[in-house]
Structure formats: C-alpha cells, structure tokens
C-alpha cells in the first residue's frame, strides 16, 4: 500500500501569521476547502495597529496577508483588497483590505463571519480562522523581569525572553479547536518565532487540542536570520523545545529547514533539509519547493 500524499488528506491545518503562513497556504491552495489556516491576531504595528488603537478589535493584518496570497482570480474586488493608500493624509499607509475587514467586523456578529464574507468575495476556498475572536495582545517578560507589552516592543527587545503571555486571557475560536481535532496534518511556521508562531500556542484550548490530536505535526523553519534579536539567537532545537514547553507535550514529528541550518542537535524527529528559497524574493519560500518538501515529510511520516 502506497504512502499518503497531500492530495489524499481530508483536513490540513496550518498555524502562524505574517508572510510565512500565507506562503504555506498558497503552496497548498490546490487542497481548496480541505485547507485551514489558523491565524495570529496579536499584531499591534502598522495599519493594523492604528486601526486597533482607533477602533479596537482583533488584529486583521495577518489575516489580510493570508487572503492576499490565496487569491487566484484577480478582480476589481481583489485589487481593492490589496490597495494601500499613499500620500501624507490620514489614510496614508492604511491597507484597504484591513479597513474592509474592520468594516465587515462591525456589520457582523462575529469576526469569523466577516472573514467568510471576504473569502466569498475574493473566491478563496481555504478556510481562515482567527486564533481568537477577542482583542488580545502579546506580553513578554525578559531575563531582567521586565514586562514588555505588544508585538512591536517585543520585536525590539535585545535581551532574552523568559516568558510569554497573552493579555487579557482570551478563549480560542471554537472552530480553530475543531479544525485541529479533525486534522490529518498540522503545520506550524515559517514566521517570526515569538510574534507570529508562539501567540497561538499560548491559548490553552489550542495547546490542549495539540496535545490530544493524533495528527502528525510539521515545523517549517525560516530561511533567514530573524530581525528580532532574542529569536535570532535561538537554535532550531531551542525553538522546538520552547514550542513544546508551552503546548505541554512533544508534538512536532518533523522539521523542514533550509540547507544551512544546523540540525545536529535535532533528535528523534524527521528532518527534511533542502533548498527552499524562492528565486525572486530573498528569504521567502518557493511555493513549489515547499509543497515538495511537505510531500517528502508526509511520506517519511508514513
């Protein structure tokens, strides 16, 4: 009997945020509605941060980025969604997609309803779920015991991070937990380690679902050195250990990394190590190479 391929899977779930999650989702977009992205909602910088400070609510920027990368049929709607205002006025720097999502959030009962309306408008088949539907921020405690609030400030830290928390304490979106419970394969990464990947794992319902799922879990590493100094100083095995510390169990079965990563200390996990970088954008994963690496990981997992 042949091993399963990605095309055989009924439910693939990817966790993360930023450009990394969007890249993974677009590389697997052929799965259509069998693909689900669970998206980080703690961003407080840029257009997203301005909207949150003015209007409250969850962070929409990472969700918009994922939607952008899943658009396969360019249209007036998709051009509007991707439009960013220039100039020096009040709208300068704002992304229209963020504003559209925020407006639909006001008109909807739940943020998830707003996302589904936009998915239908943009003809995106993959499901996208915010990690929580409640406003929440990331907080770090550094090795001096200082509390640092918000992704922007955490990214600027120069001292090691000792602990991460979400503030306030919010529940995970129930559909996100259900997606993990039903998954045949779970993927986390690539993305900024402390500010794109870790926030999702801080939700107790998500951590519990990851502890209980029989689905294999694959970590995809970044291709370049992170700008965040605390994250940049972490070795691969340390990142895996930190993620599993917060989940509460050894859950990562395979890792996919580039050829320059030191994997010598990674034990008892499948390692897929090969060229993954796109030729047109430095430090971004090539969609086809990433898809191929995920196929190899799935084959190795059996």
Swiss-Prot record:
The keyword Cytoplasm applies. GO terms for molecular function: LPPG:FO 2-phospho-L-lactate transferase activity. GO terms for cellular component: cytoplasm. GO terms for biological process: regulation of cell shape. Coiled coil: none annotated. It comes from the Bacteria. The keyword Cytoplasm applies. It is found in: Cytoplasm. Keywords: Cytoplasm. CDD domains: YvcK_like. InterPro entries: CofD, CofD-like_dom_sf, Gluconeogen_factor. Belongs to the gluconeogenesis factor family. Required for morphogenesis under gluconeogenic growth conditions. HAMAP family: Gluconeogen_factor (MF_00973). This is Putative gluconeogenesis factor. The lineage of its organism: Bacteria, Pseudomonadati, Pseudomonadota, Gammaproteobacteria, Enterobacterales.
């Amino acid at each position: 009997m042949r091993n399963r391929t990605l095309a055989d899977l009924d439910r693939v779930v990817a966790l993360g945020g930023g450009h990394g999650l969007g890249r993974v989702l677009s590389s697997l977009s052929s799965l259509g509605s069998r693909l689900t992205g669970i998206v980080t909602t703690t961003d407080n910088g840029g257009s997203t941060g301005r909207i949150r400070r003015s209007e409250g609510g969850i962070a929409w920027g990472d969700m918009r980025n994922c939607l952008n990368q899943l658009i396969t049929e360019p249209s007036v709607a998709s051009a509007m969604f991707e439009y960013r205002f220039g100039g020096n006025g009040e709208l300068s720097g704002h992304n229209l997609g963020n504003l559209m999502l925020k407006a639909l959030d006001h008109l909807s009962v739940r943020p998830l309803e707003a996302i589904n309306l936009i998915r239908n408008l943009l003809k995106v088949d993959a499901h996208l779920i915010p990690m929580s539907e409640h406003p929440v921020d990331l907080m770090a405690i550094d090795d001096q015991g200082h509390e640092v609030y918000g992704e922007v400030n955490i990214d600027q830290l120069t001292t090691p991070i000792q602990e991460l928390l979400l503030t306030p304490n919010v529940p995970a979106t129930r559909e996100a937990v259900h997606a993990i419970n039903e998954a045949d394969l779970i993927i986390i990464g690539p993305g900024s380690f402390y500010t794109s990947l870790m926030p999702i794992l801080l939700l107790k319902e998500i951590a519990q679902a990851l502890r209980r799922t029989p689905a294999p879990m694959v970590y995809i590493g970044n291709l370049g050195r992170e700008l965040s100094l605390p994250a940049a100083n972490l070795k691969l095995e340390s990142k895996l250990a930190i993620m599993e510390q917060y989940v509460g169990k050894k859950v990562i079965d395979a890792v996919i990394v580039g050829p320059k990563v030191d994997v010598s200390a990674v034990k008892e996990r499948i390692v897929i190590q090969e060229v993954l970088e796109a030729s047109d954008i430095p430090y971004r994963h090539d969609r086809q190479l990433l898809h191929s690496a995920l196929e190899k990981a799935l084959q190795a997992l059996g």
